[in-house]
């Protein structure tokens, strides 16, 4: 047994630069790794749980309000409370996933959400319904944190952006399923329809829990447990080439503080390092400048993703369409299905652009489109609200700009938030750092969801969307200033990237020796560019 006891706060000095012969370089971009693709799909299916709840609640609220005779404040609390409850799961998920592994944490998320969905479907009153949402919220919190972390850790570098956008793809798929469920059960008796809408959400959680058992464990988690042999076998299956698998294993061992010359199948790893003691101190109390910048970037991108109002649009789209002039429940639910179709279609487009265009250009373009859409939506709703007669062109603009808003969100801000925040944290901080980002995401979403109806009454619905547009404008400036491009970077290279980033340098070149040869020609993140022997990177 070979022991390794690294300091928790200070990363080991970089290993000697590897000089890779040209003979090992692939002649063309690697083909998609189908095994890693399947693993990413199974892990990301956890996000269906949140998406379904958001989508189904948007329509179920109409019937819950009538059946249980509750007011708008109670409806807002019902809609937004799941996000607040999810904090428990998100806060616990980092430690849980380091303890039992990423895979069994996903199973746990599915089991908890299953119980919550059954309780909601059987709810006799408002209090019992809130209890069911409390249980489901914990499951959602676990799912939101663990899916992007697992996917980032199992994915080959050439397609990590593509694969790590899958959680957002499945959130959108879940929203779409929720909208369709609303439409399908809307004609049932009042007391039955909304309960079926909520209770049937237990079905995907069962499928998820069974499917996840076929997944391998994260290779990074295996290394943190000292199981190098198991990690190597997983990397051999999920990498684009044997050379990449070897180099990925060396990088992970280096980050975990395991000597490069250690080749045992099982080694002793410091318990403090593998289970997170000291991590919170490094994240919150005494962070290095690089870690501080990573924290600002991760928390900022999660905050602005939700503060720009996406969950208000998705949750309250029937109410928005009613304000825009669609009067019947059927018309409103059909329009929400259209929102789901647009949102899902554009997220699929985004998955193919992430590794071609890069995170930063796509994010800035997306948020710019959101600003324009929110301004037009706020203007059209204000005109409708102030006019005594129906202004048909304003109705058309309002409906169209809801669609353009969710489209521009889905092509950038939606998927990139999860991709970016899951790949920028160093290995030793990844679980806890990612869980903090999810906490901020869910708190912001909960506040927006709970306050949207009171805010709409206080400043009109159009005024609320002007406010969201202003926040999105601030978000664009923040992203331009503080978020470097991570395309073309190894996961273990993020410390160097954030140590040297300056906002004027959009290419985010790292500091270093200009004579330094790129150490890993096959694992450039999200890029098909291949480095030849002797190529250099300078600051």
Curated annotation (Swiss-Prot):
The topology of this chain with respect to the membrane is:
Multi-pass membrane protein
The relationship between pH and activity is given as: Optimum extracellular pH is 4.5 for sorbitol as substrate.
One GO term of the cellular component aspect? plasma membrane
User: By its UniProt entry, which Gene3D superfamilies does this protein fall under?
Assistant: MFS general substrate transporter like domains
The annotated regions of Basic and acidic residues compositional bias extend over: 503-514, 530-539
One term of GO molecular function: mannitol transmembrane transporter activity
> Compositional bias (Polar residues) spans?
1-11
Respond yes or no to whether keyword Transmembrane helix is given for this record.
yes
> Where exactly are the transmembrane stretches of this chain?
37-57, 73-93, 104-124, 127-147, 165-185, 196-216, 296-316, 333-353, 364-384, 391-411, 433-453, 463-483
Which Pfam families does the annotation name?
Sugar_tr (PF00083)
Q: What does the record note about the induction of this protein? A: By wounding and insect feeding.
One GO term (biological process): lateral root formation
**Segments for region (Disordered):** 1-24, 503-539
Tell me which SUPFAM superfamilies the record gives: MFS general substrate transporter (SSF103473)
Question: So which tissues is this one expressed in?
Answer: Highly expressed in roots. Expressed in vascular tissue of leaves, sepals and siliques.
| Keywords, sorted A to Z | Cell membrane, Membrane, Sugar transport, Symport, Transmembrane, Transmembrane helix, Transport
Subcellular locations according to the entry: Cell membrane
Q: Does the record bear Zinc in its keywords?
A: no
**Role played:** Plasma membrane broad-spectrum sugar-proton symporter. Mediates the uptake of linear polyols such as sorbitol, xylitol, erythritol or glycerol. Can transport the cyclic polyol myo-inositol and different hexoses, pentoses (including ribose), tetroses and sugar alcohols.
Q: Which family does it belong to?
A: Belongs to the major facilitator superfamily. Sugar transporter (TC 2.A.1.1) family.
Q: Which PANTHER family match?
A: POLYOL TRANSPORTER 5, SOLUTE CARRIER FAMILY 2, FACILITATED GLUCOSE TRANSPORTER
Q: Which NCBIfam families match?
A: SP
> Could you identify this protein by its name?
Polyol transporter 5
Species per Swiss-Prot/TrEMBL record: Arabidopsis thaliana (Mouse-ear cress)
